């Protein structure tokens, strides 16, 4: 009986594996997979529809077409299982094996595998050290290659043309052998001695001095080492046997009408077989060489197309002129195997429908249409029906359900109770795009969604659709309930703020409810408690907005367990609406939080306070109650838009006339030649922008206040001076914008102010504005101008979405394997956090930056010296507030950047899980969360910041810095200055800053002070707000002397290096240095105009401490302001360089800027940083470049070649610090890493990315950016291999080097040294250790080619790899599953030896 039952068991192979290895298949291996050789190109017999024997679908090779039935029908049924029919040779078994069994084709002539040939860098070329061009000539029969030179002067691997070959054969006879085609290449590979090649290459790397040689040798060495280590042979890159895919994977499907649809692969295989058979026949017939060669070339081409069509030459096309889909095309790209079937699967038990709003739902509920629920929960219903005895079989149960028996609905209710379902809205940009809800059955066909979760899903009800998924197993239901239920996702993982925040109608209702109206009915009444107010309000004795006095019970959180909360009763002056809201406040929230007009921001703060003070459960209930109140009072308020709400200000015509008058004057100035065309345009745009702002201000002033009317008489109230009493306006449009429900001041301005200036699609501004608004209506010209700019917006949106999605994909890919895997890595590293100050404003407080981090050292109160919190403490709200209050300046906190966990992160370095508000759990996939948090707001970023010709960026060039607050001045350590004759302090440092500290020594502001500025304050001086700290000339850059003495010019020759220019207006003559390219006299090209200083005895003044004379070079374009022989004092200006301000560089902003930072691209026209601390000098110029030399303290010179048109900010004899900017321009992040270290790099990337997001009002925690930077830095470059197996200059995972070094140190050998390399996110994803993950990301062919040559092993550490092989991911609940599995395996581990394991593998 048992044996019988075994028959019905599925043939399942449960293989436990820890890693997947990829490599080259040897011909023997291919034959061992195969069940027979495919000899004919035939597929199936067109009459009988049976597969042809020995053909591509042969049943003898691949297995039976029908289950347990041979082809001729002699053996049918299960009892003959395993019999091989003697008539047709088919094994009687399941037809499913046609998906698994492979065949093979014996090739008549070897063929090169196109991937190893053409995928750059060509692996064949690397192994043989022959160029790809030459190999192709051999393979495609254009040249001979010498395989064995014998005693002749030829060399191995030399190419011979047809003529050469004939000549050499005449000359040497049979002393040498040469061959053509893949045979020649194979012979070379076969005869190669890998070990001796490796030896000679290692020697070459040590001895040679040439960089390129070392690079090339290292590349070859890497490939050969891999072959040596993996035990694969290079000649396997040439195919002699071709595997044939199982037929079910390349099916032939009959269509109606006797035609067939076939997979392209069959076509490609048929071509290979046809050519191969023809070649065999030609060889048997001893055909002429030229015919055979042609046939061999065609065979090579057909195998190329089969493996990767279109990689070389023209792609093979089918009958319909469409390129055929080859094996490589099957796996790569969006529609390939990886991304289509392995990473994105369609799932069962799911449905989708349109969503509608469900305002009556609780936060954890969703409305599910009965029809849908019935279909989704069918199996559960069948089971219940059977258990209850309503149906005896599944079939009967099915019938009951189809007939919609009334009992089915009762069962459905029961089945659905407490069985959560998951709702998902595409695109799922972050983890809140899928949440679990408890279904509530509803009539109709649309899913009902709770309004408060719309923000997380980014859903609206204009026709959006959502998908429903049913978690089946108990574990899945449990995870849904504990991790995914919407009530457990109140906070946004991106920044830790609540994401369940009321919006639109709800905000409007709550705002209306909490506004105060002067003279409303019932004003000034006094009530004993809120229920009394409710009665009065219901009976219409009170208005909602009336000001009243009432006693309100405030409940503090209870101290003990089971005690009632402590109540305090306080008397408040408040309004009716606010008192009503106090009823729904949870215990522990003070009434003061709602005793104000509730706008959107305030409501957000309210929910945040509730979460922190009262916990999750109370907050969710509170949010629901807020929603119900908001909707209810928005309905009662009846706020709507009417035309009279759009008030056009009376001053508008006057403002416009004044602007037109100004423009008329400027036009006249332009005509008389006083201003240029560009200046005129800029001024016009400025005037209109200002006029628009004035109109908008007048409009908002008029909108936002209204006179108070008496309730009975309807007359306007006046105060004792006869002035009208005013109050904040109850204008509907104003209320909508003010509350934050919908619209903004900018939109109201277009409705009832003036539309203002419009932009063209290229971002430039049209100088004639639209003076009308929408209330007045536009004329045809105005309408045309406005459509012009609006279209651009639509086009941009479409581009933006695609780009943003691609950025997210790259970010996820680079961080997908970063998971919290231990609690504490024990590092003492960290970064120092300060408040972020820009200009005079605190952009982000210290509290905000350290909240949710772990302190890396004890935080000490600077005044008392006591410890506020000890090392290793998670800084929560209270601690952070305390630190802020104690005026601590900086806190060292742990960071993902310095975490020492090898493959992952530790919980301490990460800190708080922002989405839960608790310390992060082991198993949290923080990498993916970081990627989503940065990618998700990407769609809100702009594609580019327009250099708005004055309109938006009308910030005038600053010419002074003034303090915003009182405090004490502190100079930054970079500042260097000299005192001039007038006793003014002149700055001579490049990156000087002035800090202003408050009385506790806490940094309040930070101002950059440029070179040449005059300082107006001393270090340590106490100043008032508004005091000027420093001033400078904005449009000219001075060259300032640090020495006094008599000037001597050198190489300053009029007409040679300088020209005399006479100013047209002032008539003064000045000397201007001319560009060497434009100098007409040949010998003047190398001359640099410079100035030296002489003392009283006419001796040259030297740089202090050296015998080098002081010399200051004048740059191109400098206007020299001193005369030869003039006496100058310290701090005087020698020359001025005019700065071009009009040429606004189009700064990449928005999304492209974020992508540029994460891709670590070298910016165009990058600035130069000083490589060392030392003295600057200029060397001899080369053509078009100037040479700058920095001599460091040890006397070592560092040279730079800098393009002539670049502005060097340093001058001769100046001392610069390592990492300081010496040539203006955007900074290259690679330089920051090299010169300033990891921390400075992280700070740079963090600040730059945050700038872009902050501009759009998106807040993202720094942690997420640090996580990404950590992944960009995960590879290191070997600077010295020591005794390790690494190669000099090789890039490896840092974890790998650390492990190897530990091993070497225990063996008392020399460890390898390395330096960090910064990789962009795309490169970092592709260079990951996991080839499965890299192949599914981009450049699949290249990744797989490289991995198979290297014989790579994928340890399946990341999330993607595990999804692809179909396992639970090693994150969250899956992490413990994997850990337990591994432990069990280790306890049972016995070593099994497989017959075809190579000796190397056994030895390992």
From Swiss-Prot:
Mg(2+) binds at residues 460, 462, 464. Its cofactor is Mg(2+); Zn(2+). InterPro entries: DNA-dir_RpoC_beta_prime (IPR045867), DNA-dir_RpoC_beta_prime_bact (IPR012754), RNA_pol_asu (IPR000722), RNA_pol_N (IPR006592), RNA_pol_Rpb1_1 (IPR007080), RNA_pol_Rpb1_3 (IPR007066), RNA_pol_Rpb1_3_sf (IPR042102), RNA_pol_Rpb1_4 (IPR007083). Gene3D superfamilies: 1.10.132.30, 1.10.150.390, 1.10.1790.20, 1.10.40.90, 2.40.40.20, 2.40.50.100, RNA polymerase II, clamp domain, RNA polymerase Rpb1, domain 3. One of its GO terms (cellular component) is DNA-directed RNA polymerase complex. It comes from the Bacteria. One of its GO terms (biological process) is DNA-templated transcription. Binds 1 Mg(2+) ion per subunit. Binds 2 Zn(2+) ions per subunit. It is an enzyme of class 2 (transferase). It catalyses: RNA(n) + a ribonucleoside 5'-triphosphate = RNA(n+1) + diphosphate. Keywords: DNA-directed RNA polymerase, Magnesium, Metal-binding, Nucleotidyltransferase, Transcription, Transferase, Zinc. Zn(2+) 2 binds at residues 825, 899, 906, 909. Its EC number is 2.7.7.6. The RNAP catalytic core consists of 2 alpha, 1 beta, 1 beta' and 1 omega subunit. When a sigma factor is associated with the core the holoenzyme is formed, which can initiate transcription. Belongs to the RNA polymerase beta' chain family. DNA-dependent RNA polymerase catalyzes the transcription of DNA into RNA using the four ribonucleoside triphosphates as substrates. This is DNA-directed RNA polymerase subunit beta'.
């Amino acid at each position: 009986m048992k044996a019988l039952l075994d028959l019905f068991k599925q043939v399942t192979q449960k293989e436990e594996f820890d890693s997947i290895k990829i490599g080259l298949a040897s011909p023997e291996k291919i034959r061992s997979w195969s069940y027979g050789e495919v000899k004919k190109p035939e597929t199936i017999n067109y009459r009988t529809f049976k597969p042809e024997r020995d053909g591509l679908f042969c049943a003898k090779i691949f297995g039976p077409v029908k289950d347990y039935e041979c082809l001729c029908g002699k053996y049918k049924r299960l009892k003959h299982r395993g019999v091989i029919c003697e008539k047709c040779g088919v094994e009687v078994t399941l037809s499913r094996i046609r998906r698994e069994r492979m065949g093979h084709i014996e090739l008549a002539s070897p063929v090169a595998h196109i991937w190893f040939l053409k995928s750059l860098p060509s692996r064949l070329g690397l192994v043989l050290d022959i160029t790809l061009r030459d190999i192709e000539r051999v393979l495609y029969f254009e040249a001979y290659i010498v395989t064995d030179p014998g005693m002749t002067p030829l060399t191995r691997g030399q190419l011979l043309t047809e003529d050469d070959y004939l000549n050499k054969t005449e000359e040497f006879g049979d002393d040498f052998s040469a061959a053509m085609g893949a045979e020649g290449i194979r012979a070379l590979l076969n005869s190669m001695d890998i070990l001796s090649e490796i030896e000679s290459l290692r020697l070459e790397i040590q001895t040679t001095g040439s960089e390129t040689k070392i690079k090339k040798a290292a590349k070859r060495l890497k490939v050969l080492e891999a072959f040596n280590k993996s035990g694969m042979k290079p000649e396997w890159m040439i195919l002699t046997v071709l595997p044939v895919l199982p037929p079910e994977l390349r099916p032939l499907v009959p269509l109606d009408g006797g035609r067939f649809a076939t997979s392209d692969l069959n076509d490609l295989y048929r071509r290979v077989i046809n050519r191969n058979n023809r070649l065999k026949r030609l060889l048997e017939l001893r055909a002429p060489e030229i015919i055979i060669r042609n046939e061999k070339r065609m065979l090579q081409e057909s195998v190329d197309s089969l493996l990767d069509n279109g990689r070389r030459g023209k792609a093979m096309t089918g009958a319909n002129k469409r390129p055929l889909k080859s094996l490589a095309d099957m796996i790569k790209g969006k529609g390939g195997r990886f991304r289509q079937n392995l990473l994105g699967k369609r799932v069962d038990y799911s449905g989708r429908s349109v969503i509608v709003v469900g305002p009556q739902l609780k936060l954890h509920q969703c409305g599910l249409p009965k029809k849908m629920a019935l279909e989704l929960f069918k199996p559960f219903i069948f089971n219940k029906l059977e258990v209850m005895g309503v149906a005896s079989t599944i079939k009967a149960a099915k019938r009951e359900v189809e007939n919609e028996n009334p009992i089915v609905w009762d069962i459905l209710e029961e089945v659905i109770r407490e069985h959560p379902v998951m709702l998902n809205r595409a695109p799922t940009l972050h983890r809140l795009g899928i949440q679990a809800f408890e279904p509530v059955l509803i009539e109709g066909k649309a899913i009902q969604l709770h309004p408060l979760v719309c923000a997380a899903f980014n859903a609206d009800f204009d026709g959006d659709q959502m998908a429903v998924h049913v978690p089946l197993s108990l574990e899945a239901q449990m995870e849904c309930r504990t991790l995914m239920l919407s009530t457990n996702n109140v906070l946004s993982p991106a920044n830790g703020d609540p994401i369940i925040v009321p919006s639109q109608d709800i905000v409007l209702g709550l705002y209306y409810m909490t506004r105060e109206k002067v003279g409303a009915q019932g004003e000034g009444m006094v009530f004993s408690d809120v229920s009394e107010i409710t009665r009065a309000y219901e009976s219409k004795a009170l208005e909602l907005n009336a000001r009243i006095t009432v006693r309100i019970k405030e409940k503090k959180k209870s101290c003990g367990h089971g005690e009632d909360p402590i109540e305090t009763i306080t008397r408040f002056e408040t309004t009716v609406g606010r008192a009503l809201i106090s009823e729904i406040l949870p215990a522990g929230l003070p009434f003061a939080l709602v005793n104000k007009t509730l706008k959107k921001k305030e409501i957000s703060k309210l929910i945040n306070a509730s979460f922190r003070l009262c916990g999750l459960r109370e907050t969710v209930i509170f949010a629901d109650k807020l929603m119900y109140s908001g909707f209810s009072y928005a309905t009662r308020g009846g706020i709507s838009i009417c035309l009279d709400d759009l008030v056009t200000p009376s001053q508008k015509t006057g403002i416009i006339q004044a602007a037109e008058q100004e423009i008329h004057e400027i036009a006249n100035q332009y005509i008389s030649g006083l201003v240029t065309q560009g200046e005129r345009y800029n001024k016009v745009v400025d005037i209109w922008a200002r006029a628009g702002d004035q109109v908008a201000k007048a409009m908002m002033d008029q909108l936002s206040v209204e006179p108070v009317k008496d309730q009975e008489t309807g007359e306007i109230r006046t105060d004792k001076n006869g002035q009208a009493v005013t109050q904040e306006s109850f204008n509907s449009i104003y209320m909508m914008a003010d509350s934050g429900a919908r619209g903004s001041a900018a939109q109201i301005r277009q409705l009832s102010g003036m539309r203002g200036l419009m932009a063209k699609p290229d971002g430039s501004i049209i100088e004639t504005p639209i003076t009308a608004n929408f209330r007045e209506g536009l004329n045809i010209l105005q309408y045309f101008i406005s459509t012009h700019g609006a279209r651009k917006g639509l086009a941009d949106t479409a581009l933006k979405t695609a780009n943003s999605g691609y950025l997210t994909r790259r970010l996820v890919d680079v961080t997908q394997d970063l998971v919290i895997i231990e609690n504490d890595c024990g590092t003492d590293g960290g970064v120092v956090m300060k408040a972020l100050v820009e200009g005079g404003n605190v952009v982000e407080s210290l509290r905000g930056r350290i909240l949710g981090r772990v302190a890396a050292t004890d935080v000490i109160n600077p005044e008392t010296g006591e410890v506020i919190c000890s090392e290793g403490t998670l800084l929560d709200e209270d601690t952070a507030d305390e630190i802020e209050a104690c005026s601590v300046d900086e806190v060292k906190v742990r960071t993902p950047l310095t975490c020492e966990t090898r493959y992952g992160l530790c919980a301490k370095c990460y800190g708080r899980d922002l989405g839960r508000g608790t310390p992060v759990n082991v198993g949290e996939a923080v990498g993916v969360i970081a990627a989503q948090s940065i990618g998700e707001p990407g769609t809100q970023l702009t594609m580019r910041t327009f250099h708005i010709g004055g309109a938006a960026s009308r910030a005038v060039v600053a010419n002074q810095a003034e303090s915003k607050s009182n405090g004490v001045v502190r100079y930054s350590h970079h500042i260097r200055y000299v005192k001039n004759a007038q006793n003014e302090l002149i700055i001579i440092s490049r990156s000087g800053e002035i800090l202003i500290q408050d009385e506790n020594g806490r940094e309040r502001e930070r101002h950059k002070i440029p070179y040449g500025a005059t300082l107006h304050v001393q270090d340590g001086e106490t100043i008032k707000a508004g005091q000027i700290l420093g001033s400078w000339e904005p449009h000219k850059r001075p060259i300032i002397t640090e020495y006094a003495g008599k000037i001597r010019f050198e190489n300053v020759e009029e007409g040679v290096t300088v020209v005399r220019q006479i100013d047209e207006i002032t008539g003064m003559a000045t000397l201007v240095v001319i560009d060497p390219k434009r100098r007409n006299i040949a010998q003047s090209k190398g001359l640099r105009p410079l100035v030296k200083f002489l003392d009283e005895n006419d001796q040259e003044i030297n740089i202090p401490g050296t015998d080098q004379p002081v010399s200051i070079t004048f740059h191109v374009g400098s206007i020299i302001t001193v005369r030869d022989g003039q006496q100058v004092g310290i701090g005087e200006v020698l020359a001025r360089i005019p700065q071009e301000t009009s040429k606004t560089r189009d700064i990449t902003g928005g999304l492209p800027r974020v992508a540029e930072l994460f891709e670590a691209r070298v910016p165009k026209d990058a600035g130069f940083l000083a490589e060392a601390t030392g003295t600057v000098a200029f060397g001899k110029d080369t053509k078009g470049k100037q040479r700058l030399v920095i001599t460091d303290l040890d006397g070592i010179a560092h040279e730079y070649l800098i393009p002539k048109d670049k502005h060097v900010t340093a001058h001769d004899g100046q001392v610069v610090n390592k990492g300081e900017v010496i040539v203006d321009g955007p900074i290259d992040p690679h330089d920051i890493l090299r010169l300033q270290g990891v921390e400075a790099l992280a700070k740079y990337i963090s600040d730059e990315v945050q700038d872009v997001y902050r501009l759009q009002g998106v807040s993202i925690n720094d942690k997420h950016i640090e996580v990404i930077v950590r992944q960009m830095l995960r590879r290191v470059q070997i600077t010295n291999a020591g005794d390790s197996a690494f190669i000099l200059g090789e890039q490896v995972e840092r974890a790998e080097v650390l492990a190897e070094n530990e091993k070497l140190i225990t063996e008392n050998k020399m460890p390898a040294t390395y330096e960090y390399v910064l990789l962009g996110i795309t490169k970092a994803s592709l260079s990951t250790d996991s080839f499965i993950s890299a192949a599914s990301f981009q450049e699949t062919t290249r990744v797989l080619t490289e991995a198979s040559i290297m014989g790579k092993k994928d340890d399946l550490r990341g999330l993607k790899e595990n999804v692809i092989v179909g396992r639970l991911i090693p994150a969250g609940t899956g992490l413990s599953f994997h850990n337990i599995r591994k432990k069990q395996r280790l306890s049972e581990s016995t070593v099994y030896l497989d017959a075809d394991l190579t000796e190397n593998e056994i030895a390992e």
